């Protein structure tokens, strides 16, 4: 399996003026690969019986290769098939294999591809106290707003995501945080020997932007914790397991038109996971993803490069692109991503102010949840079309070659009030 340094898009540290760009791995180097671990993608159209026979063959070939080693083998290479993933028409599995078995798999007529597993990273974010402009921007039709959003009303329909589920594939969620008002749900934890809590903060922060009562776009939506990270990085072995669980849970619960997945993660281009996101789309499920924080073309990132995900770049309050935000033709929409306040780890009322495309993506995931509660959007294509039809064009400065569309929730007015508090 490839260790995709598919990291959480980590939030960026605050400096005076614009947020300093924080480099994150774009291409998998030697240290990003998980030695001896692979993600195997099978060709489409194989019958269930063929898949079973293929896996029996894998076990026998793997064992024969291990037996042929004069000194024997140890470590992950001896494990064999580890986990199975099935998303719509896509069948994959992860495994620990020796080099000879990996080559045998590549020659199998059943196999589409064999990729080393890689590390994946959270999308980075930044910290500064007292900043809440992002929600005001969501209903301002792209007009520049004051940095301190207590000067701007956030206008929204009272349904506000009611009856919709937002799945957050991340570090977990502090579901006891007062911002979630009992709407936080512990879904799936892929990390072995770790509790289903958020010790890192990233997942709770993202969930708060989606559905927090104060900081959230869709203030009545449910948020489901799907833990695939324990710290700032993970591997596709855990990420695919978690994404597979999310797709199955949405499908089994008949929530396809009332659910959205948020991926505030980024790593080197990794086709197996792009294929997984694409197959979820074909199955009727909407995924929103961060563009990444390298200040480069997002086409080289996964999952930003997934063609039918909604890929989100970050914009500042005065409609400029922060230098850290990725860009390019694959970026669908721009949303608030600098100095955004939300929930945090460490207590049921903890908060933090951060920056990064990790913050931009949940603004759009929250908008998707908000629109799903208001309108009949029968498919991911309809969701994407509605979100993009609401956008305000040609406002982002330095958008490079990206589609120049900023997020808007559809409310037709904007007004200023005196500050009511400094929260």
Swiss-Prot record:
Query: Where would you say this protein principally sits, based on its record?
Result: secreted
**Biological process (GO), any one:** proteolysis
What EC identifiers does the entry list? 3.4.21.-
The domain of life is Eukaryota
Q: Which residues are glycosylated?
A: 249, 262, 349, 389
Q: Where in the cell is it found?
A: Secreted
**Domain Inhibitor I9 intervals:** 37-123
Is Signal given among the entry's keywords?
yes
Pfam families named among the record's database cross-references: Inhibitor_I9, Peptidase_S8
- Which lineage? Eukaryota, Fungi, Dikarya, Ascomycota, Pezizomycotina
Q: Which gene encodes it?
A: SUB2
Q: Which residues form the propeptide?
A: 18-123
- GO molecular function ontology, one term from the record: serine-type endopeptidase activity
Q: Which family does the entry's similarity section mention?
A: Belongs to the peptidase S8 family.
Recorded protein name is Subtilisin-like protease 2
Briefly, what is this protein's role? Secreted subtilisin-like serine protease with keratinolytic activity that contributes to pathogenicity.
- Which InterPro entries does the entry link to? PCSK9_ProteinaseK-like (IPR034193), Peptidase_S8/S53_dom (IPR000209), Peptidase_S8/S53_dom_sf (IPR036852), Peptidase_S8_Asp-AS (IPR023827), Peptidase_S8_His-AS (IPR022398), Peptidase_S8_Ser-AS (IPR023828), Peptidase_S8_subtilisin-like (IPR050131), Peptidase_S8_subtilisin-rel (IPR015500)
């Amino acid at each position: 399996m490839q260790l995709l340094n598919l990291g959480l898009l980590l939030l960026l540290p605050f400096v005076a003026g614009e947020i300093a760009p924080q480099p994150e791995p774009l291409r998998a180097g030697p240290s990003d690969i998980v030695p001896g671990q692979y993600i195997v993608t099978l060709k489409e159209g194989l019958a269930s019986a063929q898949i079973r026979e293929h896996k029996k063959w894998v076990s026998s070939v793997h064992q024969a290769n291990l037996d042929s080693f004069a000194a024997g083998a140890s470590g992950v290479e001896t494990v064999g098939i580890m986990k199975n993933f099935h998303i719509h028409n896509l069948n994959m599995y992860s495994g620990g294999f020796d080099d000879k078995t990996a080559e045998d798999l590549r020659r199998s007529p059943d196999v589409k591809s064999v990729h080393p597993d890689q590390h994946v990273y959270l999308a980075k974010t930044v910290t500064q106290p007292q900043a809440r402009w992002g929600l005001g921007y969501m209903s301002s039709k792209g007009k520049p707003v004051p940095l301190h959003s207590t000067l701007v009303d956030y206008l929204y329909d009272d349904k506000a995501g009611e009856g919709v589920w937002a799945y957050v594939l991340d570090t977990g969620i502090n579901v006891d945080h007062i911002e979630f008002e009992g709407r936080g749900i512990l879904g799936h934890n892929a990390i072995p020997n770790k509790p289903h809590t958020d010790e890192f903060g990233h997942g709770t922060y993202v969930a708060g932007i989606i559905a927090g009562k104060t900081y959230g776009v869709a203030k009545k939506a449910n948020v489901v914790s799907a833990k695939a990270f324990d710290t700032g990085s993970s591997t596709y072995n855990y990420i695919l397991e978690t994404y597979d669980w999310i797709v199955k849970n949405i499908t089994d619960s008949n929530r396809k038109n009332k659910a959205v997945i948020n991926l505030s993660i980024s790593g080197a281009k990794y086709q197996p996971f792009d294929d997984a996101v694409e197959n979820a789309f074909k199955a009727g499920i909407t995924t929103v993803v961060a563009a990444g924080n390298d200040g480069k073309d997002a086409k080289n990132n996964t999952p930003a490069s997934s063609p039918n995900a909604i890929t989100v770049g970050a914009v500042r309050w005065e409609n400029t692109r922060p230098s850290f935000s990725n860009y390019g033709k694959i970026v669908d929409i721009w949303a608030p991503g600098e100095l955004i306040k939300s929930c945090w780890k460490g207590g049921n009322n903890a908060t933090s102010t951060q920056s990064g495309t990790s913050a931009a993506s949940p603004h759009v995931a929250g908008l998707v949840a908000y629109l799903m509660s208001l309108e009949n959007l029968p498919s991911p294509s309809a969701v994407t079309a509605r979100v993009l039809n609401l956008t305000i064009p040609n406002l982002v400065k330095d958008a490079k070659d990206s589609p120049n569309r900023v997020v808007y929730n559809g409310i037709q007015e904007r007004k200023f009030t005196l500050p009511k508090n400094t929260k």
